[in-house]
Amino acid sequence: WARGVIVNSEITSPSNYRSFLHLDTWLKKNKIVGITGLDTRSLTNFIRDNGAPKGTVSFSKSGKFNIKKLTNNTIKWSGLKNLDLAETVTTQKNYVWKGLKTWKKNIGYKKNNKYSFHVVAIDYGIKKNILRYFSDFNCKVTVVSCKTSAEKILNFKPNGIFLSNGPGDPAATGRYAIDIINELIKKNLPIFGICLGHQILALALGGKTKKMKLGHRGANHPVK
């Protein structure tokens, strides 16, 4: 989960025909703090030129804040390096995706009852829309916890393995994930990953990862 949301304009009532919940309501429901009225373009330019800074977004019902305490907590935050956040967001129980496909106009989320392939997805923080795309391609998807052993994964007799997206430092998650992936590689099954999963696969194959100074935003993902 995101811990905070920063937007320029005030959040207004939704008007998109696909909308089912006001963003303000969703933030409150999930206890995510938000703030409006910030010059987000200026903030983006600052991040572009200086890298991502530490920062705090805080809420107080009384409107009073202990600035010194908030500042000290921000300064002390160690950042994402060496943080295994995947274990905090992974599924606690293995499950089979319910088969809903990607959204189509005038149809919505149609269920797929036709399966040609079986994919085991290792969940490091998987997005539902990725699962929907698997359904588009007639894949049955079994989602397992990030610490599930290679033996248990292979017991599902999958046609392929998917390593999902997720938060945190890939090297930290790799402390347990690399051994699992290396065991799966030995079985010559098709394996691919997205985002964090892709980075962990690279680590398993002897590559190195490091945090980008400026990161990337939107669709501008650099490839070298």
Regions found by a protein language model. Give the residues of each.
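RNA-binding accessory domains that recognize and position tRNA/RNA substrates
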Residues: 1-156, 168, 180
